């Protein structure tokens, strides 16, 4: 990892960045050369912290404790303590680990696993039951959790059924290597045939076409279950056919019910018209949240309001209280003529500025009203926020481009702040153009709010200018950028998307050619106006191709081809299209973009905006248009 270069860096800035590079390279000698230049600066503790982190495995406890005392109550002290505790847990120094862990309130999954392992070493018999939840975590387990799993298995606390349960979870997600690793906990005599297991991953239909040898063995039957799961995740219809075949018919009733539940779930996600019929195969089996939610979504697309209610009724009380399901339960009641009962549901979530809060308000006959700021911090209060050491360090780190460290400092510094303090900190971030912190900090208030800070309009009209150039709604563009990057100029995603409008390099080059942006170079995408030029240009092309802001929003996140594929054979209410997007990330994204657009329209002084009107109706899949496969 290489630190970004700071524009106009001073000698102290250069020293900090070179020290950071040395730390990431594990170069203690170079770090020692640059760290003294940090003395007297607000970031002085970082030199000491990085040096100690590099030798934490061998550092004496006394030296670590001295740092923790010297920097007590800081983000760096918490970060060092967490890493120190993990080192002690890794070496199974349980007494020292527990002393190091005790003051830490924030504990990630790995620390929790080491804590369970420490308690297990003390003979705590409650650990096995408490720790089982981590066993079903998808993907590879972190080192501390792997250690815990090894110790539980050695004590016989993980039985064969639980091993196969984890394998099912992983296989269904396509995490085959992790699934094979989990199966390593089985005794050799109970292990599956490796060739059959490999075939279940790559050719599941063949495994299910004829009865494998040794089908009486549990391992062979379980591999058949894994093959059916793998097939269901790629082709629910083929899986449904296989469930009627000779192999699955030999499974027991519980195994068959489980497989039908997965076929129904994947069918609903794929918008298969038979999904609800597959749900019917489950009878009165408990559904669990995902199954119930997707049953409700499948029923929404079919317009089957009684089944929408039944599916929500099948959820736990906590799950059914989510705004989405309160809203759709109200809609189901209204569709069945129970309008007063429906109003009671809408009233439970109306007034909010989230997607379903806005829709519920409109169902009650009103439009969202953005309140005037209930508190605006004075310059003195903002100056006081600037004087908080953690916030001061965060701003310096943001200035130098060390965003991960800066965000850690900021989040730690605002813990426990009241609404006035939060709004002062948010205003400080806004003035310093750290818009993501301004937004997230202002969003944390409980009673006092300032939507001007929650929904900033930065860069002095640039977004409006380019929106008008392309005939786009400025409120929608701002709503999309707020969701994409929180207005972080140098935002970079794990996939490589860059800038305010999070453009992939290939997309940026393609758009630059299309709009005739001469002398475009890949590094230009990080420049504000270039990024907005390319982003709004691409958004215009997507909107022209798909013909609807909802579809264009989905396409901007997940690609035009997917957005088109999620349409129905008949025109579909926009809110139902959004709620039934198969990807949870894209579903949240589109909800937030469209709700943001309503808020921005109000803040920009546009006529009162209806979310229902923005969502509109999504044309049927065969309605014509929207077929430009050239769009990246």
Regions picked out by a protein language model, each given a short descriptive name:
Residues 6-50, 199, 370-391, 399:
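N-terminal leader/linker segments that initiate helical-solenoid repeat arrays
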Residues 7-15, 40-46, 58-59, 73-81, ...:
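Generic helix N-cap/helix-start motif at coil->alpha-helix transitions
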Residues 34-39, 67-71, 100-105, 131-138, ...:
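Alpha-helical solenoid scaffolds that mediate protein-protein interactions
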């Amino acid at each position: 990892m290489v630190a970004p270069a700071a524009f106009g860096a001073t000698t102290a800035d250069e020293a900090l960045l070179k020290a950071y590079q040395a730390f990431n390279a594990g170069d203690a000698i170079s770090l020692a050369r640059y760290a003294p230049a940090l003395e007297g600066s607000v970031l002085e503790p970082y030199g000491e912290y990085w040096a100690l982190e590099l030798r934490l495995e061998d550092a004496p406890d006394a030296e670590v404790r001295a740092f923790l005392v010297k920097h007590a109550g800081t983000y760096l002290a918490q970060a060092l303590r967490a890493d120190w505790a993990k080192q002690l847990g890794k070496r199974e120094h349980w007494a020292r680990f527990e002393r190091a862990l005790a003051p830490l309130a924030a504990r990630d999954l790995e620390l929790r696993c080491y804590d369970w392992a420490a308690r297990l070493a003390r003979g705590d018999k409650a650990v096995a039951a408490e720790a089982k939840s981590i066993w079903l975590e998808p993907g590879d387990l972190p080192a501390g959790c792997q250690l815990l799993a090894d110790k539980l298995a050695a004590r016989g606390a993980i039985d064969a059924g639980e091993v196969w349960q984890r394998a099912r979870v992983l296989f269904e997600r396509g995490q085959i290597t992790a699934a094979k690793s989990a199966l390593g906990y089985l005794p050799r005599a109970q292990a599956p045939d490796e060739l059959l297991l490999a075939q279940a991953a790559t050719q599941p239909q063949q495994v299910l076409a004829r009865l494998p040898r040794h089908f009486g063995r549990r391992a062979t039957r379980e591999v058949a279950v894994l093959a059916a799961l793998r097939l269901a995740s790629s082709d629910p219809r083929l899986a449904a056919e296989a469930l009627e075949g000779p192999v699955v018919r030999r499974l027991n009733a519980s195994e068959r019910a489980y497989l039908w539940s997965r076929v129904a779930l994947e069918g609903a996600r794929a918008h298969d018209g038979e999904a609800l019929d597959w749900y019917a195969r489950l009878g009165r089996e408990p559904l669990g949240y995902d199954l119930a939610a997707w049953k409700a979504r499948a029923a929404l697309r079919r317009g089957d309001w009684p089944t929408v209610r039944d599916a929500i009724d099948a959820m736990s009380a906590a799950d059914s209280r989510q705004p989405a399901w309160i809203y759709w339960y109200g809609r189901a009641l209204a569709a069945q003529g129970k309008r007063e009962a429906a109003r009671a549901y809408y009233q439970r979530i109306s007034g909010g500025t989230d997607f379903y809060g806005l829709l519920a308000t409109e169902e009650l006959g009103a439009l969202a009203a953005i309140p005037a700021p209930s508190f605006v911090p004075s310059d003195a209060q903002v100056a006081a926020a600037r004087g908080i050491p953690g916030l001061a360090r965060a701003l310096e780190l943001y200035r130098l481009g060390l965003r991960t460290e800066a965000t850690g400092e900021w989040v730690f510094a605002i813990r426990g702040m009241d609404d006035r303090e939060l709004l002062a900190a948010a205003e400080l971030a806004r003035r310093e153009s750290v818009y993501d912190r301004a937004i997230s900090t202002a969003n944390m208030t409980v009673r006092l709010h300032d939507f001007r800070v929650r929904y900033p309009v930065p860069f002095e009209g640039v977004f409006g200018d380019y929106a008008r150039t392309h005939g786009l709604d400025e409120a929608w563009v701002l709503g999309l950028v707020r969701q994409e990057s929180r207005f972080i100029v140098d935002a970079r995603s794990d996939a490589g998307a860059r800038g305010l409008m999070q453009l992939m390099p290939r997309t940026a080059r393609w758009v630059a050619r299309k709009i005739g942006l001469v002398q475009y170079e890949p590094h230009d995408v990080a420049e504000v106006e270039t990024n907005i030029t390319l982003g709004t240009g691409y958004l215009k092309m997507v909107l022209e191709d798909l013909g609807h802001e909802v579809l264009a929003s989905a396409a901007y996140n997940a690609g035009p081809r997917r957005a088109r594929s999620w349409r129905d054979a008949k025109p579909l209410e926009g809110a139902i299209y959004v709620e039934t997007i198969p990807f949870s990330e894209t579903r949240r994204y589109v909800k937030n973009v469209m709700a943001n657009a309503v808020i921005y329209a109000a803040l920009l002084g546009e006529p009162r905006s209806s979310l229902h009107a923005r969502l509109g109706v999504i044309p049927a899949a065969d309605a014509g248009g929207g077929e430009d496969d050239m769009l990246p």
